[in-house]
Structure formats: structure tokens, C-alpha cells
């Protein structure tokens, strides 16, 4: 029996599922009658999406479809950070959607402090863009998971628990 147990708290999403959701989005935009002539383009980069179209209303429709497709593919909606809609040349508008991945130092510190203040039998250590929680008892780790899950809504970030050891 191990002397201590641990798990990692991370904020990640499945990149392939996101690509699949974007492909479905493009297909639906091409086929829908109200969006067919909108010249809408959706580009995906490593950490952001860009949506270019003729009007704000079209971008809002595309945004709704994106959220619907992401939900069907089990992607958390908290990974999307929608920026302000900007006007670009040629009567076009663009919206950048930042993709949230990894725990920031600020959020890691908040979670670490939360665990240290509320649970004396477990330790939290920041490891890059993840947080490792270690304890001698599995029940204490379960309590730490429940404590962090309660805080997840307030932090507005999607959290996952990995590497249970």
C-alpha cells in the first residue's frame, strides 16, 4: 500500500473534439438557408478561433451553433472566451474566441490557498500549468476534490482531475 496518494488538477480540453465541433459548425453554416450567403469563415489556430462574417447577427448565430456543437461533443463551455466583435474592412465583422487551456498562476495560487486553509491533511503544490494535491488518505483527497469542485463555478474555468496515484 502506498504511503501517500495524489492527483493533479488541470484545465484542458480535447483538441480533436474541438476540431470536430468546428467541422460540424462549418458544415451547418454552409447548409443553413439563413447563413448560406453570409460569407462566414471560421478559422482555428492553436489557442484561438476567429469568426468572420457580414453582420453581428450572423456572428451571434454562429456563436450559438458553436456552443451547441461543443456541448454535444462534451466540451466545457468555459473554455471559450469571446472577445468583442470588431469591424474589419469590406463591410465584414470579426470576433476572436480565445481558448482557455491550463491553470494560470493566479488560479493555481487561489486553489492552493483554498486547499491549505480548509484541509490540514493534504498538501498542494503548483507544477507549471497544473496543481498537484497529495495526502496520506484517499478520503482526504476526495474531500479536496469536492472542495475544488464547489469553487469551480466561481473561478469560471473548466477543471479536470487526472493522474490519480
Curated annotation (Swiss-Prot):
Belongs to the YajQ family. The keyword Nucleotide-binding applies. Keywords: Nucleotide-binding. PANTHER family: UPF0234 PROTEIN YAJQ. InterPro entries: DUF520, UPF0234-like_C, UPF0234_N, YajQ-like_sf. It holds the Pfam family DUF520. HAMAP family: YajQ. It comes from Prochlorococcus marinus (strain NATL1A). It comes from the Bacteria. GO terms for cellular component: cytosol. This is Nucleotide-binding protein NATL1_05371. The keyword Kinase does not apply. Nucleotide-binding protein. One of its GO terms (molecular function) is nucleotide binding.
